Amino acid sequence: MQNGSYYMVERPAFTARFLLGNGPPESVQDADVHVHLTDGSVRYLTFFTLPAIERVLQRQRTSGETAGGAYFWSTDLVIIPEPGVAAMARALEELVQSKDIEAVGQLIRGELQNDG
């Protein structure tokens, strides 16, 4: 569901706000996402497919960035095997369920505390 600049996905364990790269939600190959968890914390992740990474490296070979495309890096990177928000949401479901999101995603807002 589109909400301004963001594409929203709601699941029982999280709400994800995707800032999509180039392309529609069905075929986008990279996106930044804020994941709002049920404990009140918010984590940040970046999704890429391998072809999207290859395009970045090719552009960097041409531009001379990163020593002519010698490497690629992105903070909080999750590589997915296929494009689309649906594939990203499936990955998020597993990351949240397994608690791997705590290691993978940067914490940008901590758990909300109830001070009574």
Where in the sequence are the language-model features?
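Short helix/strand-capping turn motifs
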Residues: 2-101
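C-terminal charged interaction modules
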Residues: 93-116
